[in-house]
C-alpha cells in the first residue's frame, strides 16, 4: 500500500492508494482507490472539501477512484434549486404522498433498520458483492461513520419501508446508500428517496445533493443521469449537464471517458 498525496488544499491529511483490483462497475476493467487514512475523524467542512474534489464516504473510509487510463467514474451532484422533475419522477412523487419522513442519526440504528437492509440485499442484490448480508457488514457500511451522518426514513403508517443514509455537508447532503422494502416495487422508492433528499436539502437552505459517481457505461449507475441538471466533476471543474443523455449518446462516448470535456458536449448540453 502506497502513501499518496492528492493535489488539493487537503495535503495536511494522510492518504493511501490501493493495488489494482477488479472494477465493481465495468467488466474486464481494473480499479485503484485513493483513500483517506481511516484514523482521521473528519468534520463536516473537511468532508465537504473532499467531496468537492471527488471523494466519497463508505463506512469509516473516504475514497476516490484513481484508475490508470480510465476516467469513467464521474463525481456528480444535483443543484437542488434548479432541479426539475421529469414525468417519471413526478409520478413517483405523487404515488408516495402517503409516506411520512423522519430523520435519525445512524448511531441510533435498530434491528428494524437491519431487518429491512437484510431483506433488501437478499431479494434485490443476491448476485452482488454485498451478498450475503450480515449485521457486521451493515454496521461497518452504514452505521459507522467518520463524520455527521443520519438516516432519512420513510414510513407507511407504523411500518418502515425505506431508509437513505446521508452525510451532512456544508453545501448540501451526500447520498450514501438507500435500501427499501422489496415488496413495494410499484412505489419506485429508489426514485422517491432521492426526491425526498433533494427536498430536504432545499428545506435546510443548502445547494447540492451529491450522488456519488455517475458511470455512463454501467447500467446500474446510469440512473443518476436522470436528475437534471446534473453537475459533473470534469478536469477539476464542476460542469453542468442540462439534459439527460440518450443511450445512443452514451454509447458514442467510447470505452474511455476522460476527465476533459468532450468537445461535442460543450456547445450542446453543458454550460
Curated annotation (Swiss-Prot):
CC per GO annotation: cytoplasm
GO process annotations (BP): ubiquitin-dependent protein catabolic process via the N-end rule pathway
Record-linked SUPFAM superfamilies: Acyl-CoA N-acyltransferases (Nat) (SSF55729)
Catalytic activity line of the entry: N-terminal L-glutamyl-[protein] + L-leucyl-tRNA(Leu) = N-terminal L-leucyl-L-glutamyl-[protein] + tRNA(Leu) + H(+); N-terminal L-aspartyl-[protein] + L-leucyl-tRNA(Leu) = N-terminal L-leucyl-L-aspartyl-[protein] + tRNA(Leu) + H(+)
Pfam name, any one: ATE_N
Compartments, as annotated in UniProt: Cytoplasm
Natural source organism: Acinetobacter baylyi (strain ATCC 33305 / BD413 / ADP1)
Any one GO molecular-function label of the UniProt entry: leucyl-tRNA--protein transferase activity
Listed InterPro entries: Acyl_CoA_acyltransferase, Asp_Glu_LeuTrfase, N-end_Aminoacyl_Trfase, N-end_Aminoacyl_Trfase_C, N-end_Aminoacyl_Trfase_N
EC code: 2.3.2.29
Keywords, comma-separated and alphabetical: Acyltransferase, Cytoplasm, Transferase
Protein name (database record): Aspartate/glutamate leucyltransferase
Family of this protein: Belongs to the R-transferase family. Bpt subfamily.
Function: Functions in the N-end rule pathway of protein degradation where it conjugates Leu from its aminoacyl-tRNA to the N-termini of proteins containing an N-terminal aspartate or glutamate.
Main location, first listed in the record: cytoplasm
Amino acid at each position: 500500500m502506497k502513501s499518496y498525496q492528492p493535489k488539493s488544499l487537503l495535503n495536511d491529511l494522510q492518504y493511501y492508494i490501493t493495488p489494482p483490483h477488479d472494477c465493481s462497475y465495468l467488466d474486464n476493467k481494473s480499479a485503484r482507490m485513493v483513500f483517506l487514512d481511516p484514523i482521521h475523524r473528519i468534520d463536516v467542512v473537511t468532508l465537504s472539501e473532499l467531496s468537492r474534489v471527488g471523494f466519497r464516504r463508505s463506512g469509516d473510509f473516504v475514497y476516490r477512484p484513481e484508475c490508470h487510463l480510465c476516467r469513467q467514474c464521474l463525481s456528480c451532484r444535483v443543484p437542488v434549486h434548479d432541479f426539475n422533475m421529469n414525468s417519471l419522477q413526478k409520478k413517483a412523487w405523487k404515488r408516495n404522498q402517503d409516506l411520512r419522513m423522519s430523520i435519525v442519526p445512524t448511531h441510533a440504528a435498530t434491528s428494524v433498520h437491519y431487518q429491512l437492509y437484510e431483506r433488501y440485499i437478499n431479494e434485490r442484490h443476491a448476485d452482488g458483492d454485498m451478498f450475503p448480508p450480515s449485521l457486521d457488514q451493515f454496521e461497518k457500511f452504514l452505521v459507522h461513520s467518520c463524520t455527521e451522518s443520519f438516516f432519512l426514513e420513510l414510513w407507511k403508517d407504523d411500518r418502515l419501508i425505506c431508509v437513505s443514509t446521508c452525510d451532512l455537508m456544508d453545501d448540501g447532503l451526500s447520498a450514501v446508500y438507500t435500501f427499501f422494502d422489496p415488496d413495494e416495487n410499484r412505489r419506485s422508492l429508489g426514485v422517491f428517496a432521492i426526491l425526498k433528499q433533494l427536498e430536504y436539502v432545499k428545506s435546510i437552505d443548502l445547494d447540492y445533493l451529491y450522488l456519488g459517481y455517475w458511470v455512463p457505461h454501467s447500467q446500474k449507475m446510469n440512473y443518476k443521469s436522470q436528475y437534471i441538471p446534473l453537475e459533473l466533476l470534469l478536469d477539476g471543474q464542476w460542469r453542468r449537464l442540462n439534459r439527460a443523455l440518450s443511450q445512443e449518446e452514451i454509447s458514442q462516448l467510447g470505452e474511455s471517458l476522460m476527465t476533459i470535456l468532450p468537445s461535442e458536449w460543450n456547445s450542446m448540453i453543458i454550460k
